[in-house]
UniProtKB/Swiss-Prot annotation:
Official protein name in the record: Undecaprenyl-diphosphatase
Biological function: Catalyzes the dephosphorylation of undecaprenyl diphosphate (UPP). Confers resistance to bacitracin.
Species this chain originates from: Oceanobacillus iheyensis (strain DSM 14371 / CIP 107618 / JCM 11309 / KCTC 3954 / HTE831)
Pfam families the record matches: BacA
Reaction(s) catalysed by this chain's protein: di-trans,octa-cis-undecaprenyl diphosphate + H2O = di-trans,octa-cis-undecaprenyl phosphate + phosphate + H(+)
TM regions (residue ranges): 8-28, 45-65, 92-112, 119-139, 197-217, 225-245, 255-275
Gene Ontology biological process terms, A to Z: cell wall organization; peptidoglycan biosynthetic process; regulation of cell shape; response to antibiotic
Single Gene Ontology MF annotation: undecaprenyl-diphosphatase activity
GO-annotated cellular components: plasma membrane
Misc: Bacitracin is thought to be involved in the inhibition of peptidoglycan synthesis by sequestering undecaprenyl diphosphate, thereby reducing the pool of lipid carrier available.
Amino acid sequence: MNVFENFWTIVHYFVLGLVQGITEPIPISSSGHIIIFRELFGIEARGLSFEIFVNLASLLAVLIIYRKDIVRLAVNSWNFIFKQEKESKSDFMFVVYLVLATIPVGIVGVLFGDEIGAFIGEDGTTVVGITLLITAAAIWMIRNLRGRKIEGDLSTKDAVIVGLAQAVAVTPGISRSGATLVASMLMGMKQDTALRFSFLLYIPVSLGSSILEIPNIVRDPNVQELWIPYLVAFITAFIASYFALKWFMNIMRHGNLKYFAYYCVIVGVLVLIFL
C-alpha cells in the first residue's frame, strides 16, 4: 500500500469502529447499521477477526462502567458459596440468572449461526429495514413502563424470557440491548435493574463469542497485515461505546426511550424504500 491507500484504509476502519462503538450500547442495532453503511458507502472490513476486535472494545467499555457491580457480584457470590453468608444470596442468584439468560443465545449461535448469516447475506438490507421497524415497535411498547422488580426479586422465568429475547437479537436489525431491555421491563423490572441486567448479560455473550473465534483470529492474515487499522478501530469503538453507554444510561433515567423508536422507524423506512 502507498501512503494515500494507508490513510484511507485507516479512515475506513475509523468509521467502522465509530459506527460499532456508538450503536452497540444503544437500542438501534449495531449489526444492522454496519450492513447499512456497507451498502451505502461500500465500507466493509476485511477478515473475520474485525467484528471480534470491535466487540471486545465495546466489552471493555462495559466492564469499566460496570466494574463496581462486577466486583460486588463476584465477592458476594464467593461469600455465599464458601461462607454461607445469607445476605449475599441475592447477588449470587443474580449471577445465576445471568448464566441462565446466556444459554439460549449460545444454543442459537452454535446451531444456527451459519444459516442465519447465509439468510441475511441474501437480502441483508431488506431484513434490516424490517427488523428495525420491529425494534421500534418493541421499544414503543415499553416507553412508559415503570416496573418494581429489583435484583433480589428476579426469578428463573425472568432470566429465561430475557435470554430468549437476546437469542432473537442475533438477527441484524434486532438490537441486543433493545431486545433484552424490552423483555426485562415487560417482566416488571425497574429501568435501572433492566439496564444493569442487559449490559451485564452482554459480558458473557461477548466473551463467549470471542473465545470461540480465537482459532479464526490466529489463522486470519488480515490481523498482521492490518494491525494498525484494527487498532484504530478498536480504540475508536472503545471510546465511542464508553460515552454512548454513559449517554444512554442518562436517557434511561429520564425515560426518553421513545426517541429511539422514532429513529428506528425513520431509518427502517428509508432502508426499505431506498436500499
